[in-house]
């Protein structure tokens, strides 16, 4: 690591840039006053005129010529100049010793001797550093890497070069010094002095190109040739050429000044002793006379011997032996040698002030531009317009901070515009202005006009001040700079860049002026020791980064062509030019400057700096014109005059007391400024001064009375311009002029400065503002402040009222973002403070303060609640807080947090409610947990929420796992054992959740346990189980997803019972029988019409359901079945069936009597309804032997063999196939092996017992009557005759009365009552009740017994009788005794004719029905179909009832379902599907329907 170089420059922040409108641009002073509050905070600002404002360049370019100043960049910077001065002193010190200073290299870099010397001094000096071995620390401080023994090298260099100089400065005798060139490496470079001491404080000789200087000039000039390397001309060194500020012709080589090349270290060669020195260091004296020997003696030893070793001082000619010096010199020095006394004299000479030197060449504007452009393009090796401003800025500050590179430039500064013309057009000037540019002549932004405009107080300065009231011109080149300075008299300045490359500015605000001065004095005290007013000389610059590092606020800007830069009072500013350009500047002073102007004069007096004009003279001139002054200016003048008169009165009183008695009126305004300066402080005298006759033309101000001369003060004369009596009227005149304004201003000031309860209402401020407008008071700070305060107060009042009335909502918002129009609480707090800080009082302020207190209370309550744990009980409290917070029209950051907390609390409430056993007895369900977790995920994280979420998640995971396991167990195939399920339930215990599958599993286990207990009770009890219970257990077992061990055995028993029932059903039931097996086996419960209706309804239902079997359980039969199932044993079941038997016989008796009675001749034959069709009897009829009802032969199937004497039973009475008894007994025995009780088994057992009992009784009856099947051969009395006779009375079967009555009825009924029976029936007349009961019970039995047929045949063959009526009746009821196939074709035709007549009668009868009666429901129509089958339909095969399920339509669509609609043909009474015949429900309800067949037949009959 090597020594640290200067840090890269960091540009300061930009200053304000203003772009006024045309309206604002019209009045420059009004605009400057407007921007002053902003711009004075940065010291400088930039103003861009409107784009169309482009004044012509009016300067006479051909006549303009100037001599620029030479600027060596590294001499400008204060700290760099200090280093150079130090090196020059070291070089001079060794040069006087006859030695040449060579700067050593360390780590391949030139050693910074200044820094090394300063660090050693700061550490306590050479001896202390050596004693405490601090050289390594110093090396590290200088930026060298540790561990390379750099410290020892630094010590050697310090001891050899700097230590002797420091000893000399401390006053130690240096008679013997080691030469700095001894024991040095060849790589050490010789130091060439910068000749700063030779270029100090040149006498003020005004050149012909500038006005009398008002800033420090250089005191002398020298041949300013720029030196190139020896033996080479400037023309042959391009690198050197681009570092030169001008092309100066080389003069004498001995006067050349070395220049450092940029890329390389200094090429310094050891200088040879000057050849022109004729006096040798060794004094070769010819043998003198004896009397002259004593003249050349050594001042140390006092002897004159060893003349060849005697040295003669080149300064004082004193002699010293080389061996007398300590330590002795081995050789005679080759160069000049000074003795210690002369060395002290030379080195102790005071350092003269630094100043710029003038170049030796006079430039025209063209020539300077060529030189400037050539320099910049050569330096950056690119065209001038392509060099970035940032690069130039960084390179400039690098160059001013280095001592290794010497770059010289030239700057045409302070060129008087009065001689060569301004860049702006002037009236009467040589530049001819175009007509369209004449507006620029009177423009306020024309710098020739600005300083002398009415708002500028400089108009009252009588003399023309070049640079202040008259513009100065500036011609710059790249790197040419203007150093840190403030304007004369701390005035404003304005600079306009007419054309060229930008000018970079740096500025510090006026309040930081003293801070900047203190920093510069601190960092470069050596410069200020010799030049206290250094900053007034414009010769010193300092890096802005350095100033900013010490707390000085610095701002920058780049001024481009056509832009103004304004500097404000006492604002330090500096800068440099980016390239060739032309600028113009002037000063001006406004009313607000006047207090600063007087302070500046006092400041100048302390620094002994001359004034550019007399401030007191300017004030008095304005006071003399009081009637013409602006009221604001008059007020300012009055205040300034008051201070001035007070000060002058005190000074004159002081002088009078000191003894000055002579007074004399003196017209100081007739003298030039340089002729009336104080000889001490150089202040321009005006009001008064002291003179003495001993020094004519010399005066002092009243502050420096003792500095005039040594004469007694009584000899002094007080010269005065005005008496005090003259000054007071002048001040009063100004006061009267400003009195009204002052009164207004005082009132404004009073209300503006009122405190607390003394503040006035805003209406007072409005009144004052209106008054200023009425009186046309000029724009000034006070008026602007009043206007600003009034505007602020009105705005604050409006905002405060809005906040007070700002309840813009009744419910709190859901959004979290801040409304653009809402204030934050801190902003509202600041706003309230602003209200109370306003100079005026607002009625809304206390109300808003109260509102703010409420808001703060709300915030405190909210913060306390938010700091607590999330609680479900806090929902109502949070809601009330949110409701309260929503009333404030302020952005409250607690509101979104409260909303989040509310959601959290509600969520916790939901969790607690879900877990509450009272509110939710079932427990927390999985869906509730998932829903709560989903809601919880969207909540703002909180420890309470996180804990509850973790608990819910854990519970959900466990619950889901248990549910899955429970579901797997419930769906397991084959099912799991009960033990597995119970072990699973032990895991569920203690889980606070509603688990449906687990509950189902629990229910399954409970049901399984109950089932096993029931199964165990069935097996252990010893009694035969009931089939219903057994079947129910099997069904329940199938619904229990558990492996049940007894189930297999029960299923086998149930299967056996089902097989038995199927066998029994096949044995008993007729095909398509409407009766169940139990109904067949049990005694009959219902008889007659009710059973008939139910049977027909059942048959119709079978038709509608397309043949699907549906066994309708009768209520009474259900009771029987329930009683049988509930019976505990067979005995109780037999008792129940015995009761049903008695009911059966009783019902049959009633039914038979009813049916017999309606067939008696006395009956109303017109209303007689018989058969399954419930129509009148007609034609061939069949009479059931059991129920004794009559049936049309066409409606039911008759006996298969009419000649075979077999009892015919109607379809309602024929309930089963009546299997033989042996077959039934086998069924019963097979059932007993199964050991299961079922109602069918009990009924079968009872049937068998009943059948056996009946057989026994029949046999007893037959035996008791002596009947035998072999006595029926016709010999003797027939068994039936004996049976009939034994009854003791006779009964005659008469159907429908006597023949005569039947004939009448037949006639009246149009022969519809003519009917007869086709088979022989048992005559009931004379039949004993016992035999009838036996016969009825035998027919009721569903068992085929030979006794039944035997008894029937015996009862059927009764004795012949000669009774006429009976014979007639028999002839009427019974057809002729012929064979079965003896039915003639006539009888068949008669039957068909009768059928057709019935159809006609039915058609006529149905036409009388209402339309509502014609359209019946599906169930009613099914009954009508079963009861209204026509003879033609029933004449077909009645063997199958399945025909009733078919639609007669040719293309039947075969629809299915309970909702299929039917329609009946009104002719043939056949039923059709509505969809098959294309009839809608509405059409069928309103119109008669006739099928296609009937329609065709009907039309044929009509034909």
UniProtKB/Swiss-Prot annotation:
- EC numbers for this chain: 1.14.11.67
Q: Main subcellular localization, coarse class?
A: nucleus
Compositionally biased region (Basic and acidic residues): 268-278
Describe the location of the ARID domain by residue ranges: 80-170
Which reactions fall under this protein's catalytic activity? N(6),N(6),N(6)-trimethyl-L-lysyl(4)-[histone H3] + 3 2-oxoglutarate + 3 O2 = L-lysyl(4)-[histone H3] + 3 formaldehyde + 3 succinate + 3 CO2
Which UniProt key words apply to this protein?
A: Chromatin regulator, Dioxygenase, Iron, Metal-binding, Nucleus, Oxidoreductase, Repeat, Transcription, Transcription regulation, Zinc, Zinc-finger
Report the SMART domains cross-referenced here: ARID, BRIGHT, JmjC, JmjN, PHD
Cross-referenced Pfam families:
ARID (PF01388), JmjC (PF02373), JmjN (PF02375), KDM5_C-hel (PF21323), PHD (PF00628), PLU-1 (PF08429), zf-C5HC2 (PF02928)
Q: Which Gene3D superfamilies is this protein grouped with?
A: ARID DNA-binding domain (1.10.150.60), Cupin (2.60.120.650), Zinc/RING finger domain, C3HC4 (zinc finger) (3.30.40.10)
- In this chain, the stretch annotated as Disordered covers 202-223, 268-287, 1362-1381, 1403-1442
Stretches with biased composition (Polar residues): 202-211
Subcellular localization is given as: Nucleus
List required co-factors: Fe(2+)
Q: Which GO terms describe its biological process?
A: chromatin remodeling; regulation of DNA-templated transcription
Q: Does the keyword Glycosyltransferase apply?
A: no
Q: Which residue ranges does the record assign to the JmjC domain?
A: 439-605
Q: Which residues form the signal peptide?
A: none
Domain spans labelled JmjN: 15-56
Could you tell me what the cofactor note in this record states? Binds 1 Fe(2+) ion per subunit.
Q: What does this protein do?
A: Histone demethylase that demethylates 'Lys-4' of histone H3, thereby playing a central role in histone code. Does not demethylate histone H3 'Lys-9' or H3 'Lys-27'. Demethylates trimethylated, dimethylated and monomethylated H3 'Lys-4'. Acts as a transcriptional corepressor.
Q: Which family does it belong to?
A: Belongs to the JARID1 histone demethylase family.
Matching PANTHER family:
LYSINE-SPECIFIC DEMETHYLASE, LYSINE-SPECIFIC DEMETHYLASE 5B
Domain remark text: Both the JmjC domain and the JmjN domain are required for enzymatic activity. The 2 first PHD-type zinc finger domains are required for transcription repression activity.
Q: What is this protein called?
A: Lysine-specific demethylase 5B-B
- Organism of derivation: Danio rerio
């Amino acid at each position: 690591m090597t020594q640290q170089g200067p840090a890269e420059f960091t540009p300061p922040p930009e200053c304000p840039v203003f772009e006024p409108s045309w309206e604002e641009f019209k009045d420059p002073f009004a605009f400057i006053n407007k921007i002053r509050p902003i711009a004075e905070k940065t010291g400088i600002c930039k103003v861009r005129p409107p784009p169309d404002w482009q004044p012509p360049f009016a300067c006479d370019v051909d006549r303009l010529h100037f001599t620029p100043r030479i600027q060596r960049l590294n001499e400008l910077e204060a700290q760099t100049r200090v280093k150079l001065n130090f090196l020059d002193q070291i070089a001079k010190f060794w040069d006087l010793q006859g030695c040449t200073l060579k700067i050593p290299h360390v780590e391949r870099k030139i050693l910074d001797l200044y820094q090394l010397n300063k660090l050693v001094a700061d550490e306590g000096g050479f001896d202390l550093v050596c004693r405490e071995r601090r050289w390594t620390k110093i090396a590290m401080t200088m930026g060298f890497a540790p561990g390379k023994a750099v410290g020892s090298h630094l010590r050697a260099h310090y001891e050899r070069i700097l230590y002797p100089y420091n000893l000399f400065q401390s006053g130690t005798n240096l008679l013997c010094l080691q030469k700095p060139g001894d024991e040095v490496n060849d790589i050490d470079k010789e130091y060439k002095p910068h000749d700063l001491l030779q270029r100090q404080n040149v006498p003020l000789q005004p050149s012909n190109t500038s006005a009398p200087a008002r800033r420090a000039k250089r005191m002398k000039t020298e041949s300013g040739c720029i030196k190139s390397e020896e033996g080479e001309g400037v023309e042959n060194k391009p690198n050197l050429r681009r570092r030169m500020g001008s092309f100066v012709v080389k003069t004498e080589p001995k006067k050349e000044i070395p220049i450092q090349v940029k890329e390389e270290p200094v090429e310094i060669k050891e200088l040879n002793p000057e050849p022109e020195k004729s006096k040798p260091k060794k004094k070769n004296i010819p043998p003198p006379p004896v009397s002259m020997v004593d003249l050349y003696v050594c001042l140390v030893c006092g002897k004159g011997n060893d003349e060849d070793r005697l040295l003669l001082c080149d300064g004082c000619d004193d002699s010293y032996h080389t061996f007398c010096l300590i330590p002795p010199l081995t050789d005679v020095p080759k160069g000049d040698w000074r003795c210690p006394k002369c060395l002290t004299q030379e080195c102790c000479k005071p350092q003269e002030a630094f100043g710029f030197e003038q170049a030796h060449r006079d430039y025209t504007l063209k020539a300077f531009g060529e030189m400037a452009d050539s320099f910049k393009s050569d330096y950056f090796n690119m065209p001038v317009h392509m060099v970035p401003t940032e690069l130039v800025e960084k390179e400039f500050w690098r160059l001013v901070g280095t001592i290794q590179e010497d770059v010289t430039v030239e700057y045409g500064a302070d060129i008087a515009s009065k001689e060569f013309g301004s860049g702006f057009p002037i009236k009467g000037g040589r530049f001819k202005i175009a007509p369209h540019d004449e507006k620029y002549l009177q423009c306020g932004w024309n710098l020739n006009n600005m300083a002398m405009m009415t708002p500028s107080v400089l108009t009252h300065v009588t003399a023309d001040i070049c640079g202040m009231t008259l513009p100065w011109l500036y011609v710059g080149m790249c790197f040419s700079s203007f150093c840190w300075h403030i304007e004369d008299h701390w005035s404003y300045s304005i600079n306009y860049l007419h054309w060229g490359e930008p000018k970079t500015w740096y500025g510090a605000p006026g309040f930081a002026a003293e801070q900047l001065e203190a920093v510069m004095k601190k960092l470069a005290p050596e410069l200020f020791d010799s030049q206290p007013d250094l900053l007034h000389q414009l010769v010193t610059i300092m890096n802005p980064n350095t100033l900013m590092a010490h707390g000085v606020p610095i701002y920058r800007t780049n001024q481009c062509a056509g832009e103004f830069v304004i500097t404000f009072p006492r604002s330090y500013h500096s800068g440099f030019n980016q390239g060739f350009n032309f600028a113009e500047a002037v000063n001006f002073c406004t009313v607000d400057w006047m207090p600063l102007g007087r302070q500046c004069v006092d400041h100048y007096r302390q620094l002994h700096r001359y004034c550019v004009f007399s401030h007191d003279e300017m004030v008095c001139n304005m006071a003399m014109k009081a009637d013409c002054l602006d009221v604001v200016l008059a007020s300012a003048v009055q205040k300034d005059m008051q201070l001035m008169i007070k000060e002058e009165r005190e000074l004159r009183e002081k002088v009078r007391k000191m003894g000055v008695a002579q007074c004399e009126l003196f017209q100081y305004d007739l003298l030039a400024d340089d002729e009336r300066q104080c000889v001490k402080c150089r202040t321009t005298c005006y009001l008064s001064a002291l003179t003495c006759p001993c020094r004519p033309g010399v005066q002092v101000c009243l502050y420096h009375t003792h500095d005039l001369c040594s004469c007694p003060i009584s000899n002094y004369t007080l010269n005065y311009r005005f008496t005090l009596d003259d000054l007071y009227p002048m001040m009063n005149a100004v006061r009267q002029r400003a009195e009204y304004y002052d009164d207004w201003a005082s009132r404004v000031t009073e209300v503006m400065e009122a405190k607390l309860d003394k503040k006035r209402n805003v209406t007072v401020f409005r009144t004052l503002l209106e008054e200023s407008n009425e009186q046309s008071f000029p724009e000034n700070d006070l008026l602007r402040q009043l206007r600003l305060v009034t505007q602020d107060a009105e705005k604050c009042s409006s905002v405060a009222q809005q906040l007070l009335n700002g309840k813009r909502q009744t419910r709190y918002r859901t959004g979290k973002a801040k409304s653009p129009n809402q204030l934050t609480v801190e902003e509202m707090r600041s706003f309230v403070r602003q209200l109370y800080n306003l100079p005026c009082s607002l009625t809304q302020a206390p109300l808003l303060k109260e509102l703010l207190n409420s808001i703060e209370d709300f915030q405190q309550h909210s913060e306390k609640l938010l700091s607590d744990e999330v609680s479900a009980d806090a929902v109502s409290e949070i809601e009330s807080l949110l409701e309260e917070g929503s009333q404030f029209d302020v952005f409250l950051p607690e509101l979104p947090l409260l909303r989040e907390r509310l959601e959290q609390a509600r969520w916790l409430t939901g969790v607690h409610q879900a877990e509450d056993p009272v509110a939710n007895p079932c427990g927390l369900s999985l869906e509730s947990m998932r829903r709560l977790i989903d809601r919880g995920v969207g909540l703002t994280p909180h420890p309470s929420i996180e804990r509850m979420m973790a608990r819910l998640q854990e519970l959900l995971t466990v619950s889901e796992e248990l549910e899955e396991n429970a579901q797997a167990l419930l769906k397991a195939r084959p099912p799991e054992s009960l033990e597995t399920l119970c072990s699973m339930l032990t895991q569920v215990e203690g889980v606070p959740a509603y688990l449906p599958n687990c509950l189902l599993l629990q229910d399954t286990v409970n049901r399984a346990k109950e089932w096993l207990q029931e199964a165990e009770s069935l097996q252990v009890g010893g009694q035969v189980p009931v089939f219903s219970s057994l079947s129910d257990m099997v069904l329940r077992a199938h619904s229990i997803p558990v492996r049940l061990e007894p189930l297999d055995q029960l299923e086998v028993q149930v299967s056996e019972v089902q097989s038995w029932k199927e066998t029994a059903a096949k044995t008993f039931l007729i095909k398509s029988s409407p009766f169940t097996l139990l109904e067949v086996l049990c005694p009959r419960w219902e008889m007659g019409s009710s059973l008939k209706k139910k049977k027909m309804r059942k048959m119709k239902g079978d038709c509608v359901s397309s043949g699907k079997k549906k066994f309708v359980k009768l209520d009474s039969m259900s009771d029987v079945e329930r009683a049988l199932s509930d019976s505990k044993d067979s005995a109780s079941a037999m008792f129940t069936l015995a009761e049903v038997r008695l009911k059966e016989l009783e019902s049959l008796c009633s039914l038979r009597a009813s049916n017999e009675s309606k067939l008696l001749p006395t009956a109303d034959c017109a209303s007689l309804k018989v058969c399954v069709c419930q129509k009148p009897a007609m034609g061939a009829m069949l009479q059931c032997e059991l129920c004794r009802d009559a049936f049309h032969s066409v409606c039911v199937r008759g006996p298969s063999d009419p000649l075979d004497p077999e009892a015919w039973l109607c379809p309602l009475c024929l309930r089963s196939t009546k299997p033989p008894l042996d077959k039934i007994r086998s069924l019963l025995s097979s059932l007993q092996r199964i050991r299961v009780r079922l109602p069918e088994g009990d009924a079968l057992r009872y049937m068998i017992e009943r059948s056996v009992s009946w057989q026994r009784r029949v046999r007893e009856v037959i035996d008791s009557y002596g009947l035998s099947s072999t006595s029926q051969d016709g010999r003797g009395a027939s068994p039936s005759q004996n049976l009939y006779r034994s009854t003791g009375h006779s009964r005659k079967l008469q159907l429908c009365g006597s023949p005569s009555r039947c004939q009448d009825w037949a006639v009246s009924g149009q022969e519809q009552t003519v009917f007869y029976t086709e088979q022989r029936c048992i005559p009931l007349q004379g039949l004993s009740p016992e035999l009838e009961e036996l016969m009825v019970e035998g027919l009721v039995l569903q068992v085929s017994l030979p006794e039944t047929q035997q008894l029937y045949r015996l009862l059927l063959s009764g004795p012949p009788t000669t009774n006429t009526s009976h014979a007639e009746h028999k002839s009427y009821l019974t057809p002729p005794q012929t064979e079965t196939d003896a039915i003639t074709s006539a009888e068949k035709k008669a039957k068909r004719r009768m059928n057709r007549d019935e159809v006609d009668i039915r058609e006529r009868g149905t036409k009388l029905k209402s339309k509502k009666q014609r359209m019946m429901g599906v169930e009613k129509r099914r009954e009508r179909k079963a009861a209204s089958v026509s003879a033609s339909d029933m004449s077909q095969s009645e063997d199958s009832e399945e025909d009733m399920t078919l639609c007669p339509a040719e293309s039947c669509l075969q629809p299915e379902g309970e909702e299929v609609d039917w329609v009946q043909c009104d002719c043939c009474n056949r039923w059709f599907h509505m969809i098959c015949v294309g009839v809608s429900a509405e059409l069928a309800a309103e119109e008669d329907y006739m099928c296609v067949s009937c329609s065709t037949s009907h039309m044929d009959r009509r034909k």
